[in-house]
């Protein structure tokens, strides 16, 4: 049975870092935000937070709240891997889409970090779609919560706290991923 481990969490909580750890373990990673970023460029827009948010909202409005997840399903299957990591679930409709597609093979891991910790990370990472104030981060939180992010976080199988050092977080993610890798090889 194919296993999908998906990371959910508020912006800058550590989803991308968790996915990097998976990639270092040779687990294929599908980044849901890449679907949005690709659509932003396809529409000829500047890849900033405002346009990224507008396109993400528009896709969900026109194609359904699970639009991004549905676009990722074929990418997941194309990996041909028994275990795939999905970075960036944003709402309960996406969780339901993946659960319908992959059944018990779908595992949702929420990553938690407080607002102030997340904002300090945003300031350091310098992505084009990042916000430049704590109020901007709050607005992005509200936008993502309006997509059902809170319900998706509540639906997670496991929570990893990311309020401490990077080393602690990496160890926690490694432990969780190794647990699922081990259970995948024991079938």
Swiss-Prot record:
SUPFAM superfamilies tied to this protein: P-loop containing nucleoside triphosphate hydrolases (SSF52540)
Domain of life: Archaea
Disulfide-bond pairs as recorded: none
Residues holding ATP: 9-16
Record key words, sorted: ATP-binding, Nucleotide-binding
Gene3D superfamilies in the cross-refs: P-loop containing nucleotide triphosphate hydrolases
Gene Ontology molecular function, alphabetical: ATP binding
Pfam families cross-referenced by the UniProt entry: AAA_17
HAMAP family (alphabetical): UPF0200
Family label: Belongs to the UPF0200 family.
Protein name: UPF0200 protein MA_4660
